[in-house]
Amino acid sequence: MEKAMQKEQRKLPEDTWCNPLVLENYPIGFLAPGRVGKNSGSMANFNGPARDFRELGDPEVLYDDGRWYLFPSVGEAYVSTDLVNWKYEKIKFANGEKLGYAPTIVKCRGKYLLSSSWPFAGKTEILQAFEPLGPYHSLGEPVDGEGKCLAPEWIDPMLFCDDDGRLYAYWHFGGTGEGIFGIELNPDNPIQGIGKPVKLLDFNPENQFECFGDFNEHSDMAWIEGESMFKHNGEYYLQYSACGTQFRAYTVGVGRSKSPLGPFVIQKTPVAREKYGRVCGTGHGSWVKGPDGSVWQFYTSLTRRIHMFERRIGMDRVKFDVNGDAHVQITAVPQSVGGGGLGILPVSVFKKSLASSAAGCCYSGFAFDDCTHTWWMPDDIDEHPWIEVDLLQDFDIYAFQVIWAEEGVDITQGILPEPAKYKLEFFSGNDEKKLVAVWNFYDNDRDLLIDFRSMDMVRARYVRLSYLPSVNPGLKRGVNNLTVFGKR
């Protein structure tokens, strides 16, 4: 149900959010040269020169005791009580353990189990704690019922605790011909498997959305990954992602079964798929049920401005039709957690723009093209950068989203991200501009790579963003997207 706004309302509801999610302290990507060095094989995956970039992806979410715990790749954790305001939290480890890509978190028999892909974690292991944020200690490497290490390799693991307290693990390895595997684990000794691994899913070219490539053009090639298990109305939904995390067609599929270890019947239509706009390539995530019974899809959102694995995170509702098939409508406009859509639209996309300067070919129009991998950057000598958009008519403006573009981040040289200090000015008029409002955030002290804010409604035609240069002169700040939301 949509929560349409009345004409006289001057502010969006308090429970409003907009994708990609606002998450502070975006970390440096695992494959950034500052982490792996410039001679790594991943250097070929950069757009332009190899340089440090920030990313979050592959979200797994736990709802526990009134709080939502978001565990993404590369980061630590984020905690929320309302799905709107997320607080960055460090995970505590007892003996120097660490997470790699695609963590998984589950509460089973009063204890919390945590694991992640072996790359960048350094080993395959399951961790245990008595609180969601730890301290976690390693239980060791999981084995099957014969004591053999689980094979193939432990990538994108998922730990699932059923209603009866039985524990299961899911993981995958590689692309075509490999697939997704599962095994039951002993909940009293979570690294001990019961029986042998079972192959649950593999690439099926009849499901075109699984085929590799941005247009699913590789009919004999795939990369099936990102498994996640969820139980709904007595059925088991094994979620997976396909076609490649670097593509806009990256998508979520699902198989259904009456048993946690299958057999699974694949839903013929993707669950979550969006190829265009600021929120696209919506794969690899998880479902989580809230206290009111609503089910939420958290997902990865493609950026790839600097690196093919540069990602963000989004969330939207899961809806089940009468046949039990799952569907997620990906959104990139303000939404109410309690009420859905608000009838507020982007009013700035592809509108005329001006800027104080432009570095090279990073023109002002690229900040308003609703695209993830283009950006505006002011000239290096511009001491007072600003960018302005002409909405062509006066609009009732309720909110904005700015996605910053950073160049020059280098953790080996101490050039680190920092909070943006900025303001938005609003003007009305045709022949002569009249300043009608200023939203000032020069006192911002949070490192927000993505910033979404709603304020008291302003009626204006022109919107200008001005900001202070970075404190560290090596850090260059531009705008990936500035999106203004409103209505006539």
Give residue spans per PLM region:
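Beta-rich carbohydrate-recognition and catalytic domains
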Residues: 2-156, 161-219, 231-278, 292-294, ...
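Short, surface-exposed loop/turn motifs at beta-strand boundaries within globular domains
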Residues: 54, 63, 73, 222, ...
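Extracellular beta-strand-rich recognition modules
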Residues: 171, 299, 463-467
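Predominantly extracellular/luminal regions of secreted and cell-surface proteins
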Residues: 181-192, 337-369
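Beta-propeller domains
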Residues: 224-226, 232
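Short, surface-exposed coil-to-beta transition loops
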Residues: 281-283, 419
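Aromatic, loop-rich ligand-recognition surfaces of beta-strand-rich domains
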Residues: 369-435, 449-488
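Solvent-exposed serine/threonine-rich low-complexity stretches and specific carbohydrate-binding patches
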Residues: 435-443
